[in-house]
């Protein structure tokens, strides 16, 4: 009986977490695009030159073969993920006119390095653009104890700008 009770509790909590995560993503998309409803998404298929560009930015392959994006006018929002130290960091980026207008850490699954969620860090990303295909215009400062998470955010910032240029 206790095993069944524990298993039921775990299943219910994982379903609640999934719906909370979906709500966070939807709220980011509506807010960043300035809409009352989440628009239909489109896909960027990671193949050929796009896949090569993604691999150069991430120094690895992206974990999915396609990346979803949501568009409203010249605003494009992406929900992107990267591994921090051990777990995925789920982020939202909105790019407009080749600049990151909005960024947010939606789900942070690690116990340390969580400082990247705060405005003090995120504000370094907002307004950033790319000098060339490799560097951001504004430097993103490191956070002691969160180096891997900061590096992931740098890569995802570059990735969002790169993907925007391919739409």
Segments (PLM) and residue ranges:
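Sec-dependent N-terminal signal peptides
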Residues: 4-12
């Amino acid at each position: 009986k206790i095993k069944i009770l524990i298993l039921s509790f775990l299943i219910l909590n994982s379903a609640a977490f999934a719906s909370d995560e979906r709500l966070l993503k939807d709220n980011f998309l509506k807010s960043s695009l300035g809409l009352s409803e989440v628009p239909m998404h489109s896909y960027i298929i990671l193949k050929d030159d796009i896949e090569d560009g993604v691999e150069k930015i991430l120094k690895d392959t992206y974990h999915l073969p396609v990346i979803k994006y949501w568009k409203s006018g010249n605003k494009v929002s992406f929900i992107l993920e990267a591994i921090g130290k051990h777990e995925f960091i789920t982020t939202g980026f909105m790019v407009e006119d080749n600049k990151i207008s909005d960024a947010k850490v939606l789900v942070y699954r690690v116990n340390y390095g969580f400082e990247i969620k705060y405005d003090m860090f995120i504000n370094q990303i907002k307004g950033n653009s790319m000098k060339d295909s490799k560097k951001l215009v504004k430097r993103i400062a490191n956070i002691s104890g969160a180096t891997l998470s900061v590096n992931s955010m740098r890569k995802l910032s570059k990735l969002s700008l790169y993907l925007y240029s391919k739409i």
